[in-house]
């Protein structure tokens, strides 16, 4: 009845583009039945949805992170079931979470755990020879409790400043590399973020804004939205090996790495200086060489966006104001002037030689730059 109602309200063509996930985290207490009873639920749900809308996309099982044995076995057994029973499965979903902690009075992120969850999940999918099926990481986050503020868990203070966006940049690069390694079809990863109304400013909930003030992490997603075309290869002398990050995180040297895309008229390079530890660290000089530009492009326009302590960051300004919980209209206006995605410098034209350009910048600890090159 639900699917039929949705079709009636929104139209079959629209609803056919949606992804129906049958349950949430049935491997833990959100599901009170046995795994076999979940298989039956899934089978009946697929039949019901498809009866109301032939061609609808239905999938799952939206388990917790497969880095844990129980979740690993549930996902593995579910894929065995749908194969043996020949039940339709249009996409595979599971969750991946990091594990931030307080160490020595400072937040230390747990990137290794999130990437390990994904590594194990992709391994299961590949072993079942379901490489072409879309995979949706329907929750991919630095930890598991969106509604736990830093008053509940002090480690969740990471959500306010530059640690969150730089973590997300490094994590997403790892997710794509793992998809390449296992030769699976990663369709999307979702940030399980919400709106929390009536709460303090920068209370540390997993949200993209706080009382109408955008957080730096939202500017990471704004940066990512500006990257067009296809992913292209990147190498960095400062990047850490993926296997080392999965094994032990980013605990010693920082991860100075990048992600790039290109289309017929633009190239974009996102680069970051990431470390699991919140505590202050050194800046990193970065020299970026972009090759493969059209030989006819003798001059290109560089637009340089930045997230750091003084750009695209209302949190540091709010702290400088004395962390007001009842900011004045003037203070709110000033915070809004800093909460959007900001340029590090005015756009400028630079010379390209032989289809290549070189750009130098300095990346502060936990900073992210987006270099957008148009021709």
PLM-predicted stretches and their roles:
Residues 244-322, 360-370:
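Carbohydrate-binding surface patches
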Residues 326-375:
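C-terminal beta-strand-rich structural cap/linker in extracellular carbohydrate-active enzymes
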């Amino acid at each position: 009845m639900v699917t039929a109602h949705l079709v009636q309200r929104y139209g079959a063509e629209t609803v056919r583009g949606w992804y129906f996930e049958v349950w949430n985290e049935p491997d833990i207490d959100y599901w009170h039945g046995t795994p076999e009873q979940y298989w039956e639920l899934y089978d009946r749900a697929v039949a019901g949805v498809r009866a109301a809308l032939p061609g609808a996309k239905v999938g799952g099982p939206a388990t917790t992170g497969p880095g844990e044995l129980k979740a690993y076995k549930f996902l593995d057994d579910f894929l065995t079931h749908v194969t043996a029973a020949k039940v339709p499965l249009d996409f595979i979903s599971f969750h991946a979470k990091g594990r931030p902690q307080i160490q020595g009075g400072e937040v230390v992120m747990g990137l290794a755990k999130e990437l390990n969850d994904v590594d194990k999940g992709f391994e299961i999918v590949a072993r079942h020879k379901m490489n072409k099926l879309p995979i949706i990481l329907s929750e991919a986050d630095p930890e598991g409790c969106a509604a736990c503020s830093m008053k509940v868990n002090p480690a969740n203070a990471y959500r306010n400043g530059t640690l969150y966006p730089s973590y997300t940049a490094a994590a997403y690069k790892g997710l794509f590399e793992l998809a390449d390694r296992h030769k699976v079809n990663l369709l999307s990863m979702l940030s399980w973020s919400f709106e929390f109304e009536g709460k303090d400013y920068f209370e540390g909930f997993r949200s993209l804004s706080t009382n109408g003030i955008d957080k730096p992490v939202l500017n990471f997603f704004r940066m990512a939205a500006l990257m067009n075309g296809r992913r292209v290869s990147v190498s960095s002398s400062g990047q850490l090996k993926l296997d080392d990050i999965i094994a032990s995180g980013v605990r010693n040297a920082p991860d100075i790495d990048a992600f790039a895309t290109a289309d017929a008229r633009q190239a974009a390079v996102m680069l970051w200086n990431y470390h699991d530890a919140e505590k202050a660290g050194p800046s990193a000089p970065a020299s970026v060489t972009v090759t493969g530009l059209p030989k006819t492009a003798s001059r290109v326009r560089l637009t340089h966006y930045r997230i750091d302590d003084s750009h695209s960051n209302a949190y540091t300004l709010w702290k400088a104001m004395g962390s007001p919980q009842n900011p004045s209209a003037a203070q709110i206006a000033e915070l809004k002037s800093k909460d959007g995605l900001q340029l590090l410098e005015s756009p400028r034209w630079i010379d390209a030689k032989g289809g290549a350009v070189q750009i130098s910048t300095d990346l502060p600890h936990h900073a992210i730059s987006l270099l957008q090159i148009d021709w």
